[in-house]
Amino acid sequence: MLNSFQHLIVYVLNQINRFPLIGNKNKFSMKKRVTGIGGLFFKTKDPKAAKDWYKKHLGFNTDDYGCTFWWKDKEGKDCSTQWSPFAEDTKYYEPSKKDFMFNYRVENLKELLVTLKEEGVTIVGEMEEYDYGKFGWILDNDGNKIELWEPIDEAFK
């Protein structure tokens, strides 16, 4: 039986291919901020057992990191969303005390972090850059850690 958080994960993952988020068209100085959901991360007692359960019962194509869902954005570009169970003792979500963390796909992460800081948003740590994209972290109004990702989707192909 799924708990409410697991129902949320399944619902969001089912919606990704149907209604991918397109950039916010608003009065902010940046044309786009969040362009989609980059990942859904949650704590579990046994990440391997969670991956096995989702593979067996829901057909997730899991690997060491979880499951990657591929979809296309408005322009037809390949995009990915990562689903990943983490060990319940992970420190990765800190300073948040929650059992989950959302990752949002963004454009121009460096500029976005500057803008968010100017708007009074708490920035957690320094931006990091890898061959699969740039990452930054913020806290929302409830103290939830949010991961921002400027992806290089081609690195996963």
Where are these regions (language model features)?
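A cross-taxon signal for low-complexity, glycine/charged-rich
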Residues: 6, 20-24, 29
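Short hydrophobic targeting helices and cationic amphipathic motifs
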Residues: 6-8, 13-15
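Core segments of cupin and vicinal oxygen chelate
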Residues: 31-35, 41-84, 118
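Mid-chain, well-packed structural core segment of small domains
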Residues: 95-116
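Conserved short beta-strand elements that form part of the metal-binding/catalytic scaffold
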Residues: 59-97, 138-141, 145-152
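Acidic di-acidic motifs
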Residues: 46, 108, 140
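N-terminal amphipathic/hydrophobic targeting modules at extreme N-termini
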Residues: 1-2
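Vicinal oxygen chelate
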Residues: 30-39, 65, 113-157
